[in-house]
Amino acid sequence: MGDNHQATLSNDPAANAPDAAAADKGKGKAADEPSLEMSMDEEEDSDESEAEEMMADDDDDDDHDNLEPISEANIISGGRRTRGKTIDFQEAAEKLKAEDEMDDEDDDDEEFQPNDEDMRD
């Protein structure tokens, strides 16, 4: 600082050692914020143009609402989804039900008796 009590700000990375090291590491400087010197007329114009752009985007969505029905020729038949294996869904449901009943028997906590000797200090 000089005698006039003003700080000198510099954009030179060599003037400040930590900034110089950061510049060498590939970290860029922050982008300047857009200026706020826009007049009121320009602001209103940009709002209107944004609204028009939003309406144009909505028009694109309307094109997709008129979908054609699915052609049956595109539906895969012949069990290709199960790789040729036939599945008996009733048998699979019974098997799952039996497994669930076996798991319920293992979860009985009524028979559990804690060992109080292990809990003492």
UniProtKB/Swiss-Prot annotation:
Location of the region described as Disordered in the Swiss-Prot/TrEMBL record: 1-121
InterPro entries: Histone_chaperone_domain_CHZ (IPR019098)
Gene Ontology CC annotation, any one: nucleus
Amino acid composition bias (Basic and acidic residues), ranges on this chain: 22-32, 85-99
Compositionally biased intervals (Acidic residues): 39-65, 100-121
Assigned protein family: Belongs to the CHZ1 family.
Quaternary structure, from the entry: Forms a heterotrimer with H2A.Z-H2B, stabilizing the association of the histone dimer. Also, with a lower affinity, forms a heterotrimer with H2A-H2B.
Protein name: Histone H2A.Z-specific chaperone chz1
Source organism of this protein record: Aspergillus fumigatus (strain ATCC MYA-4609 / CBS 101355 / FGSC A1100 / Af293) (Neosartorya fumigata)
Source species taxonomy: Eukaryota, Fungi, Dikarya, Ascomycota, Pezizomycotina
Encoding gene, per UniProt annotation: chz1
